[in-house]
């Protein structure tokens, strides 16, 4: 299915110029894709803020990211283009040069196979359809197995780096202001052929809590956050809560607001489903609740964690990073996240 969304002439010209002027070696086309995804204002180059939003990994500090940016910026323009990205990373690929080349071939082969499947599947015999479904499933299993191995390698290398760093500086907190809504230009998606699987339903009991008492508490916390932001709250405690020495006095509440583009809503819902399933399985996660605002593609996600340390460890997990990375494409504007500590007694009271 062709993408009917309009793209700006400058974006098309920029892509054509890059393809024609750059003689990319095998496997380096990934950097064209990186530039398209990270370039939020579609000017064909990356500012430092765009670079930071895409490349920050939670290990390098802001100063280190800034130093890396200027190392790559050999043209000294305070912007990065595809040529500079390719020139820098091509010097450090090692064995991954072969990996990227193989991925490029694999991507083309899969797209070709899926295109033929889309064309021939409907008219195929029952046996041929079975074989097609089987091959799709087994191909997916093989790719997922490779993904699991890569995720283990990522976790190991990141943990090793953290342990080796003496007096680690505070990881860079991502914060980038995008002007208005996202540009309509997207990375070209090859997902026109997909199985008719049941659509992810955010109103399912596992994800959208309809318990009135619970939602009342969430609304109460929302009002409290709003009042705190207005700075007109006068704290006059009517009751003093006595906390025992070994009792954990607070838990962490995380509120996340996400405005999703209409065309990416289904993919976002699937990514959100996987994220919630993974996060909910963590021992420090007390509860996750989701609200979708009516008549809007805006989601409010409330996460309750045992403490801030558990929450910070959660942010470094692969499933959390995968969800954040996918949101680069799915969200119209940057995600808004706010955190606050709430009395642990509230949680105990509402779960007894």
Swiss-Prot record:
Report where it is expressed, by tissue: Expressed in brain (at protein level). Expressed in the cerebral cortex only in layer 4, thalamic nuclei (the mediodorsal nucleus), hippocampus (a small band of pyramidal neurons at the boundary between CA1 and CA3), interneurons interspersed throughout the hippocampus proper, interneurons in the hilus, bodies of the neurons but also their dendritic projections (at protein level).
EF-hand domain sequence ranges: 26-61, 60-95
Alphabetized, the UniProt keywords read: Calcium, Coiled coil, Cytoplasm, Metal-binding, Phosphoprotein, Repeat
Designated name of the protein: N-terminal EF-hand calcium-binding protein 1
Q: Which organism is it from?
A: Mus musculus (Mouse)
What PROSITE patterns does UniProt report for this protein, alphabetically? ABM, EF_HAND_1, EF_HAND_2
Coiled-coil blocks: 135-163, 209-275
Instruction: Report whether Ion transport shows up as a keyword of the record.
Output: no
Q: How does it assemble?
A: Interacts with STX1. May interact with CPNE6.
Biased composition range(s): Polar residues: 190-202
Q: Which residues form the ABM domain?
A: 252-340
Q: Does the keyword Protease apply?
A: no
- Where is it mainly found? cytoplasm
- GO CC terms of this entry: cilium; cytosol; nucleoplasm
Give the modified residues of type Phosphoserine.
Answer: 4, 192, 197
């Amino acid at each position: 299915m062709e993408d009917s969304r309009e793209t700006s002439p400058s974006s098309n010209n920029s892509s054509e110029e890059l393809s024609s002027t750059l003689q990319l070696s095998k496997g380096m086309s990934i950097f064209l894709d990186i530039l398209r995804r990270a370039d939020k204002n579609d000017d064909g180059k990356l500012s430092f803020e765009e670079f930071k939003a895409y490349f920050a990994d939670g290990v390098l500090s802001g100063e280190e990211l800034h130093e890396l940016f200027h190392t790559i910026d050999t043209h000294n323009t305070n912007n990065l283009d595809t040529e500079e990205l390719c020139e820098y990373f091509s010097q450090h690929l090692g064995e991954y040069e072969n990996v990227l080349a193989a991925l490029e071939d694999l991507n083309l082969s899969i797209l070709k196979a899926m295109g033929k499947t889309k064309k021939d599947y409907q008219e195929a015999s029952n046996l041929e359809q079975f074989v097609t479904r089987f091959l799709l499933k087994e191909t997916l299993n093989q790719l997922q197995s490779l993904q699991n191995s890569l995720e283990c390698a990522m976790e190991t290398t990141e943990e090793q780096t953290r342990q080796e760093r003496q007096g680690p500086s505070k990881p860079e907190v991502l914060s980038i202001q995008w002007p208005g809504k996202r540009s309509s230009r997207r990375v070209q998606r090859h997902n026109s052929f997909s199985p008719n699987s049941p659509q992810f339903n955010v109103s399912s009991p596992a994800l959208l809590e309809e318990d009135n008492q619970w939602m009342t508490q969430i609304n109460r916390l929302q009002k409290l956050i709003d009042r705190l932001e207005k700075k007109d709250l006068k704290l006059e405690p009517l009751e003093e809560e006595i906390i025992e020495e070994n009792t954990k006095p607070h838990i962490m509440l995380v509120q996340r607001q996400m405005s999703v583009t209409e065309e990416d809503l289904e993919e976002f819902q699937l990514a959100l489903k996987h994220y919630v399933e993974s996060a909910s399985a963590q021992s420090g996660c007390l509860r996750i609740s989701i609200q979708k605002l009516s008549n809007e593609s805006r989601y409010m996600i409330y996460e309750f964690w045992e403490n801030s340390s558990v929450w910070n460890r959660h942010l470094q997990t692969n499933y959390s990073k995968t969800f954040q990375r996918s949101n680069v494409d799915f969200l119209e504007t940057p995600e808004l996240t706010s955190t606050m500590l709430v009395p642990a007694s509230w949680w105990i009271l509402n779960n007894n």
